[in-house]
Amino acid sequence: MTKIMFFGTRDYEKEMALNWGKKNNVEVTTSKELLSSATVDQLKDYDGVTTMQFGKLENDVYPKLESYGIKQIAQRTAGFDMYDLDLAKKHNIVISNVPSYSPETIAEYSVSIALQLVRRFPDIERRVQAHDFTWQAEIMSKPVKNMTVAIIGTGRIGAATAKIYAGFGATITAYDAYPNKDLDFLTYKDSVKEAIKDADIISLHVPANKESYHLFDKAMFDHVKKGAILVNAARGAVINTPDLIAAVNDGTLLGAAIDTYENEAAYFTNDWTNKDIDDKTLLELIEHERILVTPHIAFFSDEAVQNLVEGGLNAALSVINTGTCETRLN
């Protein structure tokens, strides 16, 4: 019987993974550990592996997988910047991802958390907790229909986000290297700077790559409309975090919401209750009154989890049986 290791198992995924195994006549072993130099030897007797990595995979894992006859790693996220695709290819390892598992879920997150900032909910909540129930100009908002929203990246998630904002009646600008002709309700601009210059809300939906690394830094924030709101449900490396904090502090941004953080791997998805966090930048984000932080959870719905579990396992089995899969990256 084919054997697949399901690394990075969350409690809510285990039953889904085992049920998939029964349906597909595959022996699935679940483990809460991640694939790493320390765990790769567990795969000696396995045919395939799926995992949910957040940090970089060590280089010595690839040749070990090759020596064990394993031909793939199925990543259970859309992001794949934790892998060295060229090194994997050198060792005959197919890397795959799950590019679309519930774009609507992430789009709903992006819009809902932006609306919290639009309606000044963090400020209002602090006032109410202090028993201040007055109406002040500082907590007055304006309708989204009177706003311009910039969508940076109009793939599945960005497109879904744009459609929600269109339902509010917002004016929508966008930038993508490959414009989507079906999104005829928005206006594409020739650059990110052009797309954001009049935007009240900026919503990021781009992958992590050389072109997007620290795309939003001080130089980019200099082109932002004063008082704009920034939402990042894409990848942490898209933003230069100290520059983001500075932009909020000096009023360039009214506020920001981030679901991803460049150095999140050691913290996000782990319980740090009653433990000391050494990352001063992360602490500054968390403690900032005008920055909302969530732990890479924009995708987190029952539909998305089911699709990620099955997407990873289906890709692993496809490579085992055929040598390739529809979602291969290298």
From Swiss-Prot:
EC number: 1.1.1.28
Keyword annotations from UniProtKB, A to Z: NAD, Oxidoreductase
Entry keyword Electron transport: no
Active site: R235, E264, H296 (proton donor)
CDD domains, A to Z: LDH (cd12186)
Highest taxon of source: Bacteria
Pfam families recorded: 2-Hacid_dh, 2-Hacid_dh_C
GO terms of molecular function: D-lactate dehydrogenase activity; NAD binding
Catalytic activity: (R)-lactate + NAD(+) = pyruvate + NADH + H(+)
Similarity remark: Belongs to the D-isomer specific 2-hydroxyacid dehydrogenase family.
Descriptive protein name: D-lactate dehydrogenase
Protein's organism: Staphylococcus aureus
Phylogenetic classification of the source organism: Bacteria, Bacillati, Bacillota, Bacilli, Bacillales
